[in-house]
């Protein structure tokens, strides 16, 4: 990321947002990048003072950025820039607010892609089948020398060095088998939880073990703006989570270094090296599962869309789904009613004789 002479102002603005707006770390990072890119462009044009920037300059910046970015990205960039100049004006850094009338690009209301209920079932069935196929009982290393007493009696004349060399590959295979099983259990739990709750992938990877309440079958979710909500989940998700926590998680936790283990001690989901799983791995898990299940390629966010649509199809109230998804606006949740209507029209066309 290019640095600018305005970095100090950007830092102050981001600190202000962090303290007063409760925005997520990802949003703050995006705003910082947007502002740095914007002000760097003006710097290249010879601007040395924020007071030199006009509304026409900002419109010119938008025209340049629009060539390479989607409207949704431009909407976020515009919000960041408008917020920055409003803050600068309020704090006496500028004599006017050139961005006060800067218009946010309109975003077309597109229907989110979703799986059908049967496709979602197929996706989860494949993940469950992978757990059964890769099932390997891990004993924490206690059985590494199983049968070694008899072997020692028969081969007493062999050197200890020879025995150790012959046992090493078996121990390595055992560790690999246990890891594959653990990852299958983790993947199944991730897919079940994403579909059962409709949570965002960022919310999933930030979850701790303590956020799960098995007695009430609910999870505590920390969403955008650090807002918390409680979301229920069903029996299939409970079973998958219990299997992961009791059998799979301990296996992956043992692969971590002490430093990683300390940082990920409370994490619900772990990566192959025992650290807290990141969003990229979670997305890969969903994409790979979709390929293996033979359903349309989807992202974790599309799985969230699917969950919301299926819950509404089942008769849930729109306000309840809004609360479950953590939407601040009911308008955002209403998109899923449009999807449900489209699916209803499709089913109507297939089933009704006078369609």
UniProtKB/Swiss-Prot annotation:
<dbReference type="InterPro" id="IPR023009">
    <property type="entry name" value="Tyrosine_recombinase_XerC/XerD"/>
</dbReference>
<dbReference type="InterPro" id="IPR044068">
    <property type="entry name" value="CB"/>
</dbReference>
<protein>
    <recommendedName>
        <fullName>Tyrosine recombinase XerC</fullName>
    </recommendedName>
</protein>
<dbReference type="InterPro" id="IPR050090">
    <property type="entry name" value="Tyrosine_recombinase_XerCD"/>
</dbReference>
<feature type="active site">
    <location>
        <position position="327"/>
    </location>
</feature>
<keyword id="KW-0132">Cell division</keyword>
<dbReference type="InterPro" id="IPR004107">
    <property type="entry name" value="Integrase_SAM-like_N"/>
</dbReference>
<dbReference type="InterPro" id="IPR011010">
    <property type="entry name" value="DNA_brk_join_enz"/>
</dbReference>
<dbReference type="Pfam" id="PF02899">
    <property type="entry name" value="Phage_int_SAM_1"/>
</dbReference>
<feature type="region of interest" description="Disordered">
    <location>
        <begin position="138"/>
        <end position="180"/>
    </location>
</feature>
<dbReference type="GO" id="GO:0007059">
    <property type="term" value="P:chromosome segregation"/>
</dbReference>
<feature type="domain" description="Core-binding (CB)">
    <location>
        <begin position="4"/>
        <end position="89"/>
    </location>
</feature>
<feature type="compositionally biased region" description="Basic and acidic residues">
    <location>
        <begin position="168"/>
        <end position="178"/>
    </location>
</feature>
<dbReference type="GO" id="GO:0005737">
    <property type="term" value="C:cytoplasm"/>
</dbReference>
<dbReference type="GO" id="GO:0009037">
    <property type="term" value="F:tyrosine-based site-specific recombinase activity"/>
</dbReference>
<feature type="active site">
    <location>
        <position position="200"/>
    </location>
</feature>
<keyword id="KW-0233">DNA recombination</keyword>
<comment type="subunit">
    <text>Forms a cyclic heterotetrameric complex composed of two molecules of XerC and two molecules of XerD.</text>
</comment>
<keyword id="KW-0238">DNA-binding</keyword>
<dbReference type="InterPro" id="IPR002104">
    <property type="entry name" value="Integrase_catalytic"/>
</dbReference>
<dbReference type="GO" id="GO:0006313">
    <property type="term" value="P:DNA transposition"/>
</dbReference>
<keyword id="KW-0159">Chromosome partition</keyword>
<dbReference type="Pfam" id="PF00589">
    <property type="entry name" value="Phage_integrase"/>
</dbReference>
<keyword id="KW-0963">Cytoplasm</keyword>
<dbReference type="InterPro" id="IPR010998">
    <property type="entry name" value="Integrase_recombinase_N"/>
</dbReference>
<comment type="similarity">
    <text>Belongs to the 'phage' integrase family. XerC subfamily.</text>
</comment>
<feature type="active site">
    <location>
        <position position="224"/>
    </location>
</feature>
<feature type="compositionally biased region" description="Low complexity">
    <location>
        <begin position="141"/>
        <end position="154"/>
    </location>
</feature>
<feature type="active site">
    <location>
        <position position="304"/>
    </location>
</feature>
<comment type="function">
    <text>Site-specific tyrosine recombinase, which acts by catalyzing the cutting and rejoining of the recombining DNA molecules. The XerC-XerD complex is essential to convert dimers of the bacterial chromosome into monomers to permit their segregation at cell division. It also contributes to the segregational stability of plasmids.</text>
</comment>
<keyword id="KW-0229">DNA integration</keyword>
<keyword id="KW-0131">Cell cycle</keyword>
<feature type="domain" description="Tyr recombinase">
    <location>
        <begin position="158"/>
        <end position="349"/>
    </location>
</feature>
<dbReference type="GO" id="GO:0051301">
    <property type="term" value="P:cell division"/>
</dbReference>
<feature type="active site">
    <location>
        <position position="301"/>
    </location>
</feature>
<dbReference type="InterPro" id="IPR013762">
    <property type="entry name" value="Integrase-like_cat_sf"/>
</dbReference>
<dbReference type="GO" id="GO:0003677">
    <property type="term" value="F:DNA binding"/>
</dbReference>
<feature type="active site" description="O-(3'-phospho-DNA)-tyrosine intermediate">
    <location>
        <position position="336"/>
    </location>
</feature>
């Amino acid at each position: 990321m290019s640095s600018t002479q305005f970095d100090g102002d950007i830092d102050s603005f981001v600190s202000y947002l962090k303290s007063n707006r409760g925005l997520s770390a990802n949003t703050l990072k995006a705003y910082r990048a947007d502002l740095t890119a914007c002000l760097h462009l003006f710097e290249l044009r010879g601007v040395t003072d924020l007071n030199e920037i006009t509304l026409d300059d900002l419109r010119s910046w938008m025209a340049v950025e629009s060539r390479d970015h989607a409207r949704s990205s431009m909407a976020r960039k515009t919000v960041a820039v408008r917020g920055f100049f409003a803050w600068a004006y309020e704090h006496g850094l500028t004599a006017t607010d050139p961005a006060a009338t800067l218009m946010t690009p309109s975003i077309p209301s597109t229907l989110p892609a979703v799986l059908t209920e049967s496709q979602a079932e197929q996706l989860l069935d494949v993940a469950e089948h992978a757990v059964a196929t890769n099932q390997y009982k891990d004993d924490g290393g206690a059985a590494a020398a199983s049968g070694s007493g008899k072997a020692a009696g028969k081969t007493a004349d062999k050197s200890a060095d020879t025995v150790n060399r012959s046992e090493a590959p078996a121990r390595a295979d055992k560790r690999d088998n246990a890891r594959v099983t653990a990852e299958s259990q983790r993947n199944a739990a991730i897919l079940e939880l994403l579909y059962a709750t409709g949570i965002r992938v960022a919310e999933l990877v930030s979850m701790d073990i303590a956020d799960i309440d098995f007695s009430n079958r609910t999870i505590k979710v920390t969403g955008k703006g650090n807002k918390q909500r409680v979301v229920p989940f069903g029996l299939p998700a409970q079973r998958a989570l219990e299997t992961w926590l009791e059998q799979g998680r301990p296996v992956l936790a043992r692969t971590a270094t002490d430093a990683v283990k300390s940082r990920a001690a409370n994490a619900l989901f772990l990566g192959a090296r025992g650290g807290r799983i990141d969003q990229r791995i979670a997305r890969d898990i969903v994409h790979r599962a979709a390929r293996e299940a033979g359903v349309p390629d989807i992202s974790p966010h599309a799985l969230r869309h699917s969950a919301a649509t299926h819950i509404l199809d089942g008769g849930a109230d729109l306000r309840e789904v809004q609360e479950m998804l953590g939407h601040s606006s009911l308008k955002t949740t209403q998109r899923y009613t449009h999807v449900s209507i489209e699916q209803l029209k499709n089913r109507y066309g297939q089933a009704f004789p006078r369609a």
